[in-house]
Amino acid sequence: MTEVTALVTGTSRGIGAAIAAALRGRGVRVIGHATRAVDDETIAADFAEPSSPQLVWEEAIDLADGNIDILINNAGLFEANPLDVSDIQWLDSWEDTLRINLTSAAQLSRFAVKHWLAEGTGGRIVHIASRAGHRGDSPDHWHYAAAKGAMLALHKTIARAYAADGILSYAITPGFTDTAMAGDYLASRGGGGLLADIPLGRVASPQEIAAIALFCALDAPPSMTGATLDANGASYVR
């Protein structure tokens, strides 16, 4: 049986770590990515650097002996960018967030699509977007909402363009998830009030999001390509 290999970005913690564990539990070889490498199967790179996505892809292809079947775009940055900071601070934060949350995903998706077209094999991309891509975010997070909304447009475009080639694209839009990134924000905004906006009464766990990603990566039927799966405790219902 041919080994299935996945490249997953942002695997050091939270959703990315849970996705990597879930895939490995199904026998998938996972090549991870983090700002700092933790093992021989994790590639270290800072996606704020424009050249990093290409270097990650090339190293992943080498580690995988030329065969990557699944790409999961999970790496992300969620930092406040208030209106009253200096103009240059606001712009720097905007550009860093879009580069890490959107541009790196677009670059890696491009490399993956080109690879699968050349090999004639097909493949799957799973984009970890956000509820913010649908309904917007706080006044301090224009950049995050814009990046995640654009990721959804990227996902739909890939799905429509390459379905006939066996290249499938799925997106997941979590609401608040129990990660360090979201936890700091919940605490700063008064977590109880925000939880009141979630009919389920709690945030999602990383393992719940990982279960959806696992389904998209391995089990979702091809006819679902282009689908966006929400996981927000009914805090935003489309």
Could you describe each region identified by the protein language model?
Residues S12-R13:
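Conserved glycine-rich cofactor-binding loop
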Residues F78, L214, T225-R238:
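Short C-terminal tail/terminal secondary-structure segment
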Residues S109-R110, K156:
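A short, exposed helix-loop element centered on a Lys and neighboring polar residues
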Residues A163, L168, M224-G226:
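Short, small/polar-rich loop/turn modules that mediate ligand/substrate recognition or access, typified
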